[in-house]
Swiss-Prot record:
Keywords, in A-Z order: DNA-binding, Methyltransferase, Plasmid, Restriction system, S-adenosyl-L-methionine, Transferase
Family per similarity comment: Belongs to the N(4)/N(6)-methyltransferase family.
Lineage, top ranks: Bacteria, Bacillati, Bacillota, Bacilli, Lactobacillales
GO annotation terms (biological process): DNA restriction-modification system; methylation; mismatch repair
Residues holding S-adenosyl-L-methionine: 17, 21, 62, 194
Protein name (database record): Type II methyltransferase M1.LlaDCHI
Gene from which the chain derives: llaDCHIA
Length: 284
């Protein structure tokens, strides 16, 4: 996709997402390889970098199956999705939100179609507190209703643009483990890892936006996957916190420290300026 096409359809993330990278895009793009073949993003989240690059050939993945279902429904059923979101917008209230949220507690969600589930999540992310996606140990959504005067629940133009892009390019959409998502990566491809971050302190639990969580062992496994891709000639980039553990794990590679502004935490004290790292296996 050339620049004119990208500007015409105005791609951007369809939702806020914890750890979203929109503000870090200049840093990331500066450190990216100049040329690459396929693009892989195993922790796609809101897709800030993916939509900015708008690659013609890509594999996107996330272990959050509800999130990935949103991508699939925007691709396959955009008009029905828009219709359902329009209904949610018409009915929107705190009571309506809490009732819809409780559908993963009383079994109603199991009777929903895939597009209905996508509309549910996309609606809740537009009106809940700070745009958070958070579930408890039973995989039940537990974010309270937000205080927005006039939230934009239906973005028809954006959904149609994303659908057009996903259908007109070779984009493989997966939901599962990051290792499976990069199995096909070859020499000259580019992989960007944006995993749940290693906590900066003992009081911060390992981030979990799926009920399965992402453990220390997963972080080590990710580092080993990074090394394996490096040995295959793949360009690899990874974002993480500027924690001693992260710097120790990636000490054999190039570590770039950048200042970021965290804007999507549950507590106001967790938002603000913070140092992060971008790791690359190639020179810049």
């Amino acid at each position: 996709m050339n620049l004119l096409q990208k500007n015409k359809i105005n791609l951007r993330p369809f939702t806020k997402w914890t750890g979203g990278k929109r503000q870090l895009l200049p840093h990331i793009q500066y450190l990216m390889p100049e040329k690459y073949n396929h693009f892989f993003e195993p922790f796609i989240g809101g897709g800030a970098l993916f939509f900015e690059l708008a690659p013609q050939k890509a594999v996107i993945n996330d272990f959050n199956s509800e999130l990935i279902n949103c991508y699939r429904q925007m691709k396959d059923n955009p008009e029905q999705l828009i219709e359902l979101l329009t209904n949610h917008q018409r009915e929107n209230s705190k009571e309506y939100y809490l009732d819809l949220r409780s559908s993963d507690r009383d079994g109603r969600i199991d009777k929903m179609s895939e597009v209905e589930r996508a509309a549910r999540i996309m609606y809740m992310l537009r009106v809940d507190f700070n745009g958070l996606y958070r579930v408890n140990s039973k995989n039940q959504f537990n974010v309270p209703y937000g205080r927005y005067k006039n939230p934009k629940i239906v973005d028809k133009e954006l959904i149609e643009s994303i659908s057009e892009y996903l259908n007109n390019n070779s984009i493989k959409i997966m939901s599962g483990d990051f290792e499976k998502a990069v199995k096909e990566a070859q020499d000259g491809d580019f992989v960007y890892f944006d995993p749940p971050y290693i906590p900066l302190s003992e009081t911060s639990a390992f981030t979990s936006y799926t009920h399965e969580g992402f453990s220390y062992e997963d972080q080590v496994r990710l580092r080993d996957c990074f090394k394996q891709l490096d040995s295959k000639g793949v360009f690899v980039m990874l974002s993480n916190s500027s924690s001693p553990l992260a710097e120790e794990l990636y000490k054999d590679f190039n570590i770039h420290k950048i200042e970021a502004t965290r804007t999507n935490g549950a507590k106001s004290s967790s938002r603000g300026k913070i140092t992060e790292i971008i790791v690359t296996n190639y020179g810049n």
